[in-house]
Amino acid sequence: MTELKTLLLFLATAVAEIVGCYLPYRWLREDGSAWLLLPAAASLALFAWLLTLHPAASGRIYAAYGGVYVFVAVLWLWGVDGVRPTVWDITGSLIALCGMAVIMFAPRGA
């Protein structure tokens, strides 16, 4: 799998997880409708399925995915929550992405 496809798959996985967690948050914390739980469950099921599409050992996928999750969560903070990220939010998310790149794309011995 190419680096771009891997990154796009990680991004889709992160969005599915964040949506799946955000909707119950809206229901519980912001007096949203209980109907939000249905798309939340579907989104979390999609998240779990997307994790199976990554072509590496599960532990490596989970570790690398964490870096992308941090980056997407900061974008969510800005785009959905309406909170502008600080320079430290951006710096931390870029460091996390660098960690993901090392974990996923470093040369491996045979």
UniProtKB/Swiss-Prot annotation:
SUPFAM superfamilies membership: Multidrug resistance efflux transporter EmrE
Keyword Cell membrane among UniProt keywords: yes
Protein's name according to its UniProt entry: UPF0060 membrane protein azo2656
Organism: Azoarcus sp. (strain BH72)
One GO cellular component term: plasma membrane
Membrane topology: Multi-pass membrane protein
Spans traversing the lipid bilayer: 4-24, 33-53, 61-81, 87-107
Keywords linked to the UniProt accession: Cell inner membrane, Cell membrane, Membrane, Transmembrane, Transmembrane helix
UniProt KW Cell membrane keyword: yes
